[in-house]
């Protein structure tokens, strides 16, 4: 109770534009003798909280404007105070460029995608013939379009994204390769140890990670963050596949497409940005 009051009082002083040294020295009675380090931490957490609240408001407004806000989704958004989780919840409603899945939906293939995703004993190859039209000229085109819709659903699955993030946090590898046309430049030589380098991201010290990123930024190396592809597929399979059925092979193809085209680039970039932020803080 007392700690909560002290934090509340400190936040109020910060909102009144009092500086951290001033609060620490002259408002000890109000803050319960908090020192500068503690006040700085409160200020940092308060800023993070404000960012989350603003983002939450913007997300709710956007989804409401699309008439897509269900009571269940509203509750999930209201209860979340994790920025990444909020972005995952918003992903299906985010305005984006026209995707392959959008084209497939326009061509009437969403019902076929739902049948395949249900993974029951339907003869999907036969059912695909019922979705032919001017744009979808054969069975394989219908199945391909349905798989593209499924790939987007998998990409937007909050549980898939969470589990892949965990995999990358634990097991991601950094790989660097020299850009051959730049290899012999004088300025490239200070980065020569990264011309062909690979190590677990968790083992890379901050100074090395930042040096690699500088080398990439200056165009001397290509930098990749990767996780074992089979482990990534296993993560998705466990959350998406429902055992063997005539649809299984189509869902597996959609999983592979979703991971390579959509999930892997996004999760790898997130993992790298997080690692860079930590490295910057430690440098």
Name each model feature, range by range.
Residues 3-26, 30-37:
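N-terminal cofactor/phosphate-binding cores enriched in small/glycine residues
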Residues 1-10, 45-52:
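N-terminal acidic-hydrophobic amphipathic loop/helix motif that frequently occurs adjacent to catalytic
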Residues 22, 38-41, 48, 52-283:
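Duplex nucleic acid-engaging cores and interfaces of nucleic-acid transaction enzymes
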Residues 28-32, 45-46, 72-73:
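Short hydrophobic/aromatic-rich motifs at helix boundaries and adjacent loops
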Residues 2-3, 30, 69, 110:
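Short coil/loop linkers at secondary-structure junctions
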């Amino acid at each position: 109770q007392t700690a909560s009051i002290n934090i509340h009082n400190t936040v109020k002083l910060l909102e009144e534009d009092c500086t951290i040294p001033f609060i620490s020295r002259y408002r000890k009675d109000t803050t319960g003798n908090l020192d500068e380090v503690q006040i700085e931490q409160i200020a940092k957490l308060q800023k993070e909280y404000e960012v989350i609240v603003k983002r939450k408001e913007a997300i709710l407004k956007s989804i409401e404007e699309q008439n897509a806000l269900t009571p269940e989704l509203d509750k999930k958004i209201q209860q979340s105070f994790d920025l990444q989780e909020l972005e995952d919840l918003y992903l299906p409603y985010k305005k984006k460029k026209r995707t392959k899945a959008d084209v497939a939906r326009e061509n009437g293939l969403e019902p076929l995608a739902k049948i395949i995703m249900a993974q029951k004993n339907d003869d999907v190859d036969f059912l695909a013939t019922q979705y032919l039209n001017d744009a979808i000229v054969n069975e394989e085109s219908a199945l391909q379009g349905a798989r593209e819709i499924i790939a987007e659903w998998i990409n937007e699955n909050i549980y898939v994204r969470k589990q892949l993030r965990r995999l990358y946090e634990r097991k991601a590898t950094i790989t660097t390769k020299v850009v051959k046309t730049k290899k012999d430049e004088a300025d490239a030589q200070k980065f020569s140890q990264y011309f062909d380098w690979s190590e677990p991201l968790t083992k890379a010290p901050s100074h090395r990670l930042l040096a690699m990123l500088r080398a990439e930024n200056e165009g001397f190396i290509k930098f990749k963050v990767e996780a074992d592809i089979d482990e990534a597929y296993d993560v998705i399979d466990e959350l998406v596949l429902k055992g063997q059925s005539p649809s299984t092979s189509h869902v597996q193809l959609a999983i592979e497409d979703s991971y390579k085209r959509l999930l892997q680039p996004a999760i790898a970039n997130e993992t790298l940005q997080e690692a860079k932020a930590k490295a910057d803080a430690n440098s």
